[in-house]
Amino acid sequence: MKIAIGCDHIVTDEKMAVSDFLKSKGYEVIDCGTYDHTRTHYPIFGKRVGEAVANGLADLGVCICGTGVGITNAVNKVPGIRSALVRDMTTALYAKEELNANVIGFGGKITGELLMCDIIEAFIKADYKETEENKKLIAKIAHLESHNANQEDPDFFTEFLDKWDRGDYHD
């Protein structure tokens, strides 16, 4: 099984710990970045994880930022992605079993590495429990998706990053 994983600069160490754990369990990890602590932007890496899963390069995805809120929102903008921000086993299992989530997100500064690893392993092993009710819920969620052709442009974030480099945006 292939797992795409991505993060922002705040939780690079946590992502590497999760990646190492997944590899130790025999999973193939597709590391979508970031790879160091240089200031960056979580939407870039949420999009990369989402695209890897949506395009079939990965079976599931894991996104991590400081709180998990930003990167989970970003990955959910990729058509075909159903991601849940999780901090406990119950939420992760519900997301997979009832809503067929294909990505989970974490706040790496909120949820510890060991707990993240336990939750991810349970998420991977859980099966979607297809029922008529679940299928209808997922169809309703999918109906909300909007497709933005600009997202497919490899330079989607270039203008934003150029403005950042010029100092137009600040934390």
Swiss-Prot record:
| Official protein name in the record | Galactose-6-phosphate isomerase subunit LacB
| Disulfide topology | none
Quaternary structure, per UniProt, is:
Heteromultimeric protein consisting of LacA and LacB.
Picking any one GO molecular function of the record gives: galactose-6-phosphate isomerase activity
Could you tell me which HAMAP family the record lists for this protein? LacB
Q: Can the keyword Nucleus be found in this entry's annotation? A: no
> What Enzyme Commission number(s) appear in the record?
5.3.1.26
**What is stated as this protein's family in its record?**
Belongs to the LacAB/RpiB family.
Top-down, what is the taxonomic lineage of the species of origin?
Bacteria, Bacillati, Bacillota, Bacilli, Lactobacillales
Which keywords does this chain's UniProt record carry?
A: Isomerase, Lactose metabolism
Originating organism = Streptococcus equi subsp. equi (strain 4047)
Q: In which pathway does it act?
A: Carbohydrate metabolism; D-galactose 6-phosphate degradation; D-tagatose 6-phosphate from D-galactose 6-phosphate: step 1/1
Highest rank taxon of the organism: Bacteria
Question: Pfam families in the record, alphabetically?
Answer: LacAB_rpiB
